Amino acid sequence: MSDILSSLAYLTGKPVASAKIKAQPEHFQVREDLGFAFTGEGEHLLVRIRKTGENTSFVANELAKACGVKSKDVSWAGLKDRHAVTEQWLSVHLPKGETPDFSAFLAQHPSIEILATDRHNKKLRPGDLVGNEFVVTLSEVTDVADVEQRLEKVKQVGVPNYFGSQRFGNDGNNLEEASRWGRENVRTRNQNKRSMYLSAARSWIFNRIVSARLENGVFDKFIDGDVAQTASGTQLVDASNMAALQAQFAQGEVAITAALAGDNALPTQADALTLEQPFLDEEPDLMALIRGNRMRHDRRDIALKPQDLAWTVDGNNITMTFSLDAGSFATSIVRELVIEEKVEREY
């Protein structure tokens, strides 16, 4: 994983095995699940694509050209990895109801396939998905037995719900820029950059808080003043309800949360506030950016438990299948299993 994550704690200790990740695009497959049906009519053409070795923005721009529209008229629910084989929907604003001839587009881009088209009355917006299904192959694993033991642990309790290195840009550039923007009070109309840098800022503070809970032995334990996520909303933890909430946590019915920092005060109290607040105070530049853009405080589960996790072993290769809710990172699961070996990619 990226060096920016190297300081963060592991649930079961730093992995002893190494492996190659994404040695081939087919070793990291992602299938998007929007979780809702289309209306079958409307101003927006929905195009389901499968791309290999391409990023979402590039495909969207090329699709816009093929449809004779501007790039801003093509949108998506989530960005997908470049070094992978991924399936997702893109929406194109074509209010006249036309369906373009994509034959030239497909001939020009053999790494892109169109799997289906449909119509909908709304465009796709970031976050308009329930999750993603993954097929991930770890190749040339140096200690298969250790990885399988770790997989059993992940299946039972999950992993730290860290934001992956993708959130912070190449070599952490997004985080560095977020700090600079906060320090220099930068103002911009570039919504994409502002969104990226704000996300990096909040994600980094969250990651540090989660790491601290691991280091302090309270990753799977409520402490006084925590904010629990329940089926009906959030609940402040104190002596009167801690035992009951801990029992519900053991059954997977409630979750422990950590801060996604905002310009308002943390809702945590007592011991939980003592744990979280220093990480906001230690990042004055990031907090200046967050407050300057009036981001409101939010919470995020500190544990990530993959759904339907299964795996097969073929020699020194391990192939995993699992599903994750939107906003979770498959790389955070891989990080708990192996140390990533450098791959010289030709794609």
UniProtKB/Swiss-Prot annotation:
GO molecular function, one term: tRNA pseudouridine(13) synthase activity
Entries under CDD domains matching the protein: PseudoU_synth_EcTruD
GO annotation terms (biological process): tRNA pseudouridine synthesis
Record InterPro entries: PsdUridine_synth_cat_dom_sf, PsdUridine_synth_TruD, PsdUridine_synth_TruD_CS, PsdUridine_synth_TruD_insert, TruD_catalytic, TruD_insert_sf, TruD_pseudoU_synthase
Superkingdom field: Bacteria
A Gene Ontology term for the protein's cellular component: cytosol
EC number(s) stated in the UniProt entry for this protein: 5.4.99.27
Role summary: Responsible for synthesis of pseudouridine from uracil-13 in transfer RNAs.
Protein name: tRNA pseudouridine synthase D
Location of the active site: 81
Source species: Vibrio campbellii (strain ATCC BAA-1116)
Family the entry assigns: Belongs to the pseudouridine synthase TruD family.
Group of enzyme by EC: isomerase
Record key words, sorted: Isomerase, tRNA processing
TRUD domain mapped to chain residues: 158-305
tRNA processing listed as a keyword: yes
Recorded catalytic activity of this chain's protein: uridine(13) in tRNA = pseudouridine(13) in tRNA
